[in-house]
Amino acid sequence: MNDKKVIVLAAGGTGGHLFPAEALAVELRQRGYDVHLITDERARSFVRRFDEEHTHIVSSATFTRCHPFALIKTILSLLKGMGQSLRLFYKLRPVLVGGFGGYPSFPPLFIAVLMRRVTFIHEQNAVMGRANRVLAIFVRAIAGGLLSPKGAYAHKTLLTGNPVREAVLKAAEIPYHSPVGEEPFNFLVFGGSQGASFFSHIVPEAVALLDDQNRKRLRIVQQVRGDAAGLIKIYRDMGVQAEVAPFFDDMAERMAHAHFILSRAGASSVCEIAVIGRPALLIPYPYALDYDQAENAALLARVGGAQIISEKDLSAQKLAALLTQACCAPHLLEKQALAAKKVGQPYATRCLADMAEALIAGRLLSDIKEELFDENAT
């Protein structure tokens, strides 16, 4: 018989929602808890830290502006997910239920609230997502990755930060070195799952506009979602050394060795750039809900840790000018890298686990905030 206390974490079936849940699960297991995951079918290809016994798929759907029948179908799907969550909770008897965003987190968190279980949500972005926005009204505590400590829920918001991978923490130990003279210039480009195709077009156009000296210095590592072979040929024809692939297993290490990064501004990307401490040009994904990527990027830009340009304002000429500036101003790169690292939160996983244990122990939120998180927030 398993005498460990059970904690249930619920997350949408994408990497951005799942990763912080998995990171917390690893930490909580080390502290003696039995941790389960509730998610949807999409997660099967992402989940790495939960076995089948501890992974539970519930029915879920996303609200969209479409036909009334689709709306009815969505509501029925969520109701079904609530029933599945109710049966699971009666079986597991969790002492804590945490949500990490995405609609699959809504049914279990809503049922947990009705069952008077201790609950919290974790919001990775600077702007709260739709599911978390509703759940924020009812849960006991809100853990903020990039959230502002102010607002309607300030009294129950704890600034834990966003958990980062162990590989990122290891990469953060590598000091930043800005290249000088004729030294190679490592340029890392990644766009995540959203909008990487934009970079596949504009980056080679910008590289073609560089002068010969700076172009020869470039060492490009670029993540793409489309024709990797075609992009490799374009760079080869320009005489540029480049690695192009849909995915890099060692992305954290590549970030550590980058001299300049071009990226979208998803919460995990922004936090990893900050923890490792690398200068970056952030292009918020323009179709992100609630413009959360623009707000994420602004947090890093305000302290001088990154530059921001909207996609509509980024031309090949503009990017070429910024690349030229980066190649020729190593002191500015070092200043930006230092500013980014100062706001990194490498201990977010530990902070999140501390919060979870304090909630289980029945501690007052005011005490938790004062004793555990006031120092972390500064």
Curated annotation (Swiss-Prot):
The protein's name in its UniProt record: UDP-N-acetylglucosamine--N-acetylmuramyl-(pentapeptide) pyrophosphoryl-undecaprenol N-acetylglucosamine transferase
Native species: Bartonella tribocorum (strain CIP 105476 / IBS 506)
Assigned protein family: Belongs to the glycosyltransferase 28 family. MurG subfamily.
One Gene Ontology CC term in the entry: plasma membrane
Pathway(s) the chain acts in: Cell wall biogenesis; peptidoglycan biosynthesis
SUPFAM superfamilies: UDP-Glycosyltransferase/glycogen phosphorylase
Compartments, as annotated in UniProt: Cell inner membrane
Reactions this protein catalyses: di-trans,octa-cis-undecaprenyl diphospho-N-acetyl-alpha-D-muramoyl-L-alanyl-D-glutamyl-meso-2,6-diaminopimeloyl-D-alanyl-D-alanine + UDP-N-acetyl-alpha-D-glucosamine = di-trans,octa-cis-undecaprenyl diphospho-[N-acetyl-alpha-D-glucosaminyl-(1->4)]-N-acetyl-alpha-D-muramoyl-L-alanyl-D-glutamyl-meso-2,6-diaminopimeloyl-D-alanyl-D-alanine + UDP + H(+)
HAMAP family assigned: MurG
Flavoprotein recorded as keyword: no
Recorded topology in the membrane: Peripheral membrane protein
InterPro entries membership: GlcNAc_MurG, Glyco_trans_28_C, GlycoTrans_28_N
One example of a Gene Ontology biological process annotation: peptidoglycan biosynthetic process
Record keywords: Cell cycle, Cell division, Cell inner membrane, Cell membrane, Cell shape, Cell wall biogenesis/degradation, Glycosyltransferase, Membrane, Peptidoglycan synthesis, Transferase
Enzyme Commission (EC) number: 2.4.1.227
Primary role: Cell wall formation. Catalyzes the transfer of a GlcNAc subunit on undecaprenyl-pyrophosphoryl-MurNAc-pentapeptide (lipid intermediate I) to form undecaprenyl-pyrophosphoryl-MurNAc-(pentapeptide)GlcNAc (lipid intermediate II).
Gene Ontology MF term list: UDP-N-acetyl-D-glucosamine:N-acetylmuramoyl-L-alanyl-D-glutamyl-meso-2,6-diaminopimelyl-D-alanyl-D-alanine-diphosphoundecaprenol 4-beta-N-acetylglucosaminlytransferase activity; undecaprenyldiphospho-muramoylpentapeptide beta-N-acetylglucosaminyltransferase activity
Record-listed UDP-N-acetyl-alpha-D-glucosamine binding positions: T14, G15, G16, N125, R165, S193, Q293
